């Protein structure tokens, strides 16, 4: 079975948060393979103006305090951003038919994606029962770390880092089933 790590960059914290970008990588949680990747910027005007998603001022202010590289990637991405519907269709096309999705926190990324797919009237491209949560693994292994590559709060860089963290944690916990 193929696994995918998904990360979102958003302009809010609720299930209706506008999605600024989506990053995803295919990976083997019990090995060291990280495969094909996906990265797309989402037009915030599409999220808010067309689909009624809700910007959170606290999150916008939080973004202003992030690194120059993260802020510039977010701004530059809006120039070539896809509509929410186009971005979700592209993510669905990227994912294998039978996939186990992961994210850092099940109550954040998965909730926002489920809401977004529902808004654009597209089916969720995975079975919700297969959703996996990195935050739980990190809680069981709080001292395990992986060297960070890339830009913090870049959806693709974060997805790669999170996939490597799952692999690292499961190497030290071979009895855990993913």
What are these regions (language model features)?
Residues 9-11, 25, 105-106, 111, ...:
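Anionic group-transfer/hydrolysis microenvironments
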């Amino acid at each position: 079975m193929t696994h995918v790590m998904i990360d979102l960059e958003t302009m809010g914290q609720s299930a209706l948060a506008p999605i600024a970008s989506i990053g995803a990588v295919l990976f083997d949680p019990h090995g060291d393979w990280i495969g094909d990747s996906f990265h797309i910027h989402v037009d915030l005007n599409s999220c808010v103006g067309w689909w009624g998603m809700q910007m959170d001022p606290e999150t916008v202010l939080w973004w202003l305090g992030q690194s120059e590289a993260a802020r510039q990637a977010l701004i530059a991405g809006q120039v070539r951003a896809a509509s929410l519907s186009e971005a979700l269709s592209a993510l669905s096309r990227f994912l294998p038919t039978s996939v186990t999705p992961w994210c850092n926190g099940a109550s954040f990324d998965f909730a926002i994606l489920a809401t977004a797919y529902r808004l654009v009237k597209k089916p969720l491209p995975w079975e919700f029962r297969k959703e996996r949560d990195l935050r739980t693994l990190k809680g069981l292994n709080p001292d395990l770390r992986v060297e960070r590559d890339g830009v913090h709060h870049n959806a693709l860089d974060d997805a790669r880092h999170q996939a490597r963290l799952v692999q690292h944690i499961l190497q030290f916990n071979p009895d855990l089933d993913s």
